[in-house]
Structures are given as C-alpha cells and as structure tokens.
Amino acid sequence: MANHDICPRSGKGYTIPILIDCLKRGLNVGADFSLLIGTAGIGSNPDPLTSGLYFDLDMLDRHDFFIEHDASLSRADASTGNNYSFNQTIWDTVLAYYNGMANATIPVASKARYNRVTTEASRDPDFSYSPVQFILSYGETALYLSTMGDPITGVAPLEYVRSLFEEERLPYELGWQPPKTTTTLASLGAMGLELNAASGEQVPEGIILGENSLRAVLIGLNAATGEIENDKLHALANLTGALGGVTSTLTSTLNGLTGS
C-alpha cells in the first residue's frame, strides 16, 4: 500500500495509529487485527523502548519473524540465500492449482498453500515450520482471500490475487475496491479453520486453530498452553494495548484443552 501512498511511501516510521488508518482505508481491515500485527511489527525493531514504538518495513525481513518464513507462496526458503525476491517458479506452482479458474477459493487456496509446505519440507534440510508458522501461514492465506475478495466466502478474483503477488500493487486498474465487509481477527480465524479443514493438514498437538490462536501468537503467547513464549513481544503488547482480550484468549484456549 506504500506504492499507492495509502501507507508511508518511505517504508519508515510505521506506528500503530498509522497502520490502523492505512489498513482500514486501503483494505478495510479492522483495528483489532491491525493492532495485533502492528505490535508484532514493532517487535522487529531492535530497541523499540529506546527508539520508539514503531517499525520500518525493512525490519520485517528477519527469518521466522512473522512476515518472513519458509514455504512462502511466492518466495524461496531462507536456506537458498534469497528469501526476499519474488520467485515466479514458486508462484507458478501455486497458480497451477487454479488451472484456468477465474477465482481463488478456500478449497483450492488451501491445497496450494499446503503443497508449498510439503514441497519445502521434503527438499529443504533447514526447513522451519513451528506451530507459530503453522498458525500465521493460514492467517496469511485468509488475509489475501479476504482483502482481494470476500472476508466471508473467501472467493477472490484470481486476477486481483495475481496483481497483488506479482506486481505488489492493489489492483485498482482491474476494478478492485476494498471489500465492503471488514476483515477482522474473528473472520480471519474462522477462514483459517475452513482452510485447514480443506487441506487435511494435521493441527499441531494442543493447538485449537482460530481467532484465539492467531491472537495468542501475535502477543507472544504459546497458542497451546497460553504461557508467555516471547517476552519482548508480550511486553510490547502490554504497552500498545494489544493485551486487551488476553484473558478471554487464555480462558478459551485452556477450556478447549480441558474440554470444559
């Protein structure tokens, strides 16, 4: 969105208020999710307590820090030495699943995503895929289906999706407009569940995929136990207000584990 001057074009000095505003205006993403990913973004700042509660886009490139991870839909794994440039060969393996379809859908997007996981797991000896990456990977696929299409049905015109990935632009010239329905943490969690059901991928032990698990990893909690797993991120979540709802997250997680 920096390419469209919706977010700061410099890629510098992203604060939570800036992110909430530009994600709402640019993609109709709700403040609940923007607050969480903004907090996670600030976690990429080497010293946010001294320099300020902000992040620059180039800080997000660190391997296995939320944005950058193995089994990307359009980038090679970190072990190749170039995990930041668009990779047409990899992206073509995703497009192959659509086989002439006009729209991206939950069932097909799910299978294309899972193929990337199994492909890299089989050929990359340094492949990294923790429960955190498992949860965030489903969230990412839900996010592009929601913002390029419909946050409820998950149907998105494939030409919009291709423009987003291949040109790194919002496809206004193709007729796209931000969806009328707001994308929220709850809608992303619900779509993540549908994506997982469509793929047949086994959920890591103790994880209950959905809104609460997505919130948990973005505020530094272990999604299976509810315990603090990332001290820095959890402390930042306290400062930014992202811990709001943490009590319900812990309660829901633990109730799910105990069956109560």
Enumerate the language-model features and the residues they cover:
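Polar/charged low-complexity regulatory segments
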Residues: 1-2, 7-260
